[in-house]
From Swiss-Prot:
Chain residue ranges for the region called Disordered: 189-246
Protein name as annotated: Homeobox protein DTH-2
GO biological process: cell differentiation
Start-end of DNA-binding region: 133-192
Family assignment from sequence similarity: Belongs to the NK-2 homeobox family.
UniProt KW DNA damage keyword: no
Extent of Basic and acidic residues compositional bias: 191-219, 232-246
Keyword Kinase in annotation: no
PROSITE patterns (alphabetical): HOMEOBOX_1 (PS00027), HOMEOBOX_2 (PS50071)
Gene that encodes the chain: DTH-2
Length: 363
């Protein structure tokens, strides 16, 4: 082939290009060969350049297995429309030799691989840009935190000029001061809510504990109450009432006064039933007159002057001593004498008769 001019340069070309150049140079049609038996006489002798659509080596099972194992073919799905265009162009080059098709597929696989690599690099760059755009956490110094907390205790909400002034003092931006105050207010509210919840839990716990203790001590209380009810004093209800918040001091004093009046009341019912005209002055006058008359002294002395007591003596009517009870002589005068106890009108008349008789001589 070296004797043919221009054929040496064709060795580096593809077989299809070399064949076309050779035909154009010799001016011979594809149906005959000018070189005799040394070269191929017809196109049909180029068996390697037969129609690739009928071969099962590329489109059959073996080809599908090779395609599944080839990483370049798996990346072709990322090409999208480019892969569809390449597949459509394959039908146009159906008469092209198999080596050309293999080169085209290799080029398509490399292109798809490069496109996928570019997409991954682009996604990584976007992620890096997003991470760079995210603001870093700012760490405050101890002096800045101290100044912020001191101002927060004085004022929980700051206006825009106040934030700007405070930010200039501690070398921060007004936005940083604003965010710090917002976070600190939220923390304070949350801590306050947690504290209230803990207090409620403690109260409920103590309440339940007291209820349980009362239930455990209730049998002992019933036994103690049953034993102490027999030895209870009148002052215990008052003490219990004081514990319940009631005041019975005035009521107790009134009861005490009534008891004292009842104790001071005389045992004899004479002063409660004598008429109004039998007063102290009248009784003193009658006593002075009765001392001069032995009959009045013996008969009426015990009723008019009950405080004077003496032992009765046996004998006639005149032998009754002063201060003798009228009950002892009630049967002598009238069966109703002891019932009326000197309140009967006949007894009042008889007493006046005896008093008038004191001035007359007695037979």
């Amino acid at each position: 082939m070296s004797g043919i001019p221009g054929l040496a340069g064709m060795s580096s070309m593809s077989p299809y290009s070399a064949y076309a150049a050779l035909t154009q140079h010799t001016g011979v049609s594809s149906g005959s060969s000018p070189f005799g038996s040394q070269y191929c006489s017809s196109v049909n002798d180029f068996n390697p350049y037969s129609d690739p659509r009928g071969s099962n080596t590329w489109y059959g099972m073996a080809a599908s297995a090779n395609a599944s194992n080839d990483p370049r073919m798996t990346m072709s799905r990322l090409m999208g429309s480019a892969a569809a265009a390449a597949s459509s162009s394959m039908s146009a080059y159906s008469g092209i030799p198999t080596n050309f098709h293999q080169g085209m597929h290799s080029a398509m696989g490399m292109a798809s691989l490069g496109a996928a690599t570019y997409d991954h690099q682009k996604a990584a760059m976007q992620f890096n840009n997003m991470s760079q755009r995210r603001k870093r956490r700012i760490l405050f110094s101890q002096a800045q935190i101290y100044e912020l907390e001191r101002r927060f205790k004085q004022q929980k909400y700051l206006s825009a000029p106040e934030r700007e002034h405070l930010a200039n003092l501690i070398n921060l931006t007004p936005t940083q001061v604003k965010i710090w105050f917002q976070n600190h207010r939220y923390k304070c509210k949350r801590s306050q809510k947690d504290k209230e919840k803990e207090q409620q839990k403690e109260k409920s716990y103590h309440l339940k504990k007291n209820i349980v203790d009362d239930k455990e001590r209730s049998p002992n209380k019933q036994i103690c109450n049953a034993s102490s009810s027999d030895r209870s004093t009148p002052e215990e209800p008052v003490a219990k009432a004081k514990e319940s918040g009631l005041d019975f001091s005035n009521h107790k004093i009134d009861n005490l006064n009534l008891k004292m009046e009842a104790d001071l009341e005389p045992k004899s019912s004479l002063y409660s039933i004598i008429p109004p005209y039998l007063t102290n002055s009248y009784a003193q006058q009658t006593q002075s007159e009765a001392q001069t008359s032995p009959i009045i002294n013996n008969v009426l002395g015990s009723n008019l002057f009950p405080e004077r007591k003496s032992t009765p003596t046996m004998g006639p009517l005149t032998s009754y001593s002063f201060g003798q009870s009228m009950d002892s002589i009630s049967s002598f005068y009238s069966p109703d004498f002891s019932l009326y106890n000197c309140a009967h009108p006949y007894m009042a008349a008889s007493s006046s008769y005896f008093m008038n008789a004191a001035s007359r001589p007695w037979n």
